[in-house]
Amino acid sequence: MKGTARENRPPRGVEKSMLISSKEKIRNFPLVLGKLVRSYRFALAAFLIPLFIRSIPEILVGPYPVGWDTIAFYVPNTLDWAAGKAGFVQILGTAPLMYMISAPVYWVSRVNPVWIFKIMGPILYGSMIWALFRFLKIGLKWPDRQALGGALLTSLYFVTLRISWDLYRNMLGLTFILLSLPLIEDMKGPRKQALLSVLIVLAVAADQLTGVIALVLVGARALTGLTRNQREEFARMVKVALPGTVLFVATAYAGLIAPGIGLVNQQAPVPTLTSASLSIGFLGYAYLALIPLIVIGLRKVPNIELRTWSIFCIATVATAILPFFGPIVQSYRWSLLLDVPLCVFAAAGLYRLVESVHPGIGWARNLPRLILPTFSAVLVISATLYIALPAQQAIVYYTAYPELLPTSMVQNTIPLSDLGNLRSLLDSAAGRINSGTALITHQAIYGWARAYLPSLNNQLINYRYNAPLTGVEMAKSEGYSSILMIWWIDGSGWHNQPNVPSGFSVLLQIGDLALYTYN
């Protein structure tokens, strides 16, 4: 046996050389890693810098969530999916891709889902901006520095930050759209066609609205081929889009038709000032600062998909002022999804402006050097104020549309100053709840109760966006004799409910929040 073992070993000289080779590989690893980092430094920066930017509000709020949808919907839905409480039709109608990530992670780790989304938010933001950088470099053929500059401009603009605040499914869907754009431009070969088809399916599965955009972009290409008698191009596009189209129809049916919601919403015969303000007004407000750069850069970006994307979103926003009927989706969501192409046009405009200025004499000699630093400084300062200032101290510009745009990134369904107080009141409520007691919650509080009072889920009554007395009636109809509620004190309430109705009395007040009982 010993002789056999010696025979199977390599000769002593070979063994020594293998050992030396292994040591050299270990010694050279930092050099190899350094070369890789230098080779991909722009792509790494396009991912890591936005990830850091989006991490700032998460750090500022501590262990609590950032974003309305995050705590109001993502956390409760993840808990329900992991517990098997969601049916197939409900799952399909939700556009399930994000929950197909969060629910298994929660089911395996059992970590509070708040932490899952605190980590997911920055990663999704970094991924989306990296995908944009990749498109600018590969799809538009921009140099690395220009592509990184365009990506960072987009990541610092307040509309993009608003998307990152709580529209995680939009970020996921936009990532797949941006990855698909170079393939739509050049989809020669079955491998590229298959990859494009998969990306469209993922964009649809991530979010219904990004699914619409993905299908519109491919559909526009197909129609272009048909009008030019390019039947092979048309057939190829139809084949690529077919799986995504089938999934979208199924998702729309499960999410809108089956529950009886429908695809259209009734509107006034004559547009009101309010409807015009919330649609066209918000669109102008969101991109007012970029309009000069967009106008300058529009001709510098001949990409058909970006133009189709822009025209479609603007046209859909305009449907909000149509008489009688309009889409069920609120128009501001399409204004937000217009962010990526308009930021690309603005970045092209800024680059063109810097390159085209010819200094003369005197003060004009330094003008080209001042344009980019000045714009960058204004962009960074405005982003910093939006990210870091509390909601109550937000700059005036960010308070114009509080129902559509959070005044600050450091809030969720409640402002930063109330986060710890709400957690304390939830703990106090947990100690007062027995078998005959229900905790009624507004949608703003419901996700918090689900996340931090998991043992009391069966005694939570969610009255959504209605008045508290609706929750009282719901609790009584289920046989509860004692009713608790957490809300702000009179005069301090958020979400269009500044005061608490008569019949409630304060049990415990912490800051501007209080635990109430219904008499």
Name every feature range the model reports, one short phrase each.
Residues 32-40, 226-240, 292-317, 326, ...:
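Membrane-interface helix-loop-helix junctions at transmembrane boundaries of multi-pass membrane enzymes
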Residues 1-57, 367-377:
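Start-transfer (signal-anchor) and selected internal transmembrane alpha helices
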Residues 9, 47-48, 127-130, 163, ...:
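Extracytoplasmic
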Residues 239-245, 353-397:
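Signature aromatic-anchored transmembrane alpha helix within multi-pass, membrane-resident enzymes
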Residues 73-76, 90-113, 203:
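Short hydrophobic/aromatic helix or loop-helix immediately within or flanking a transmembrane segment
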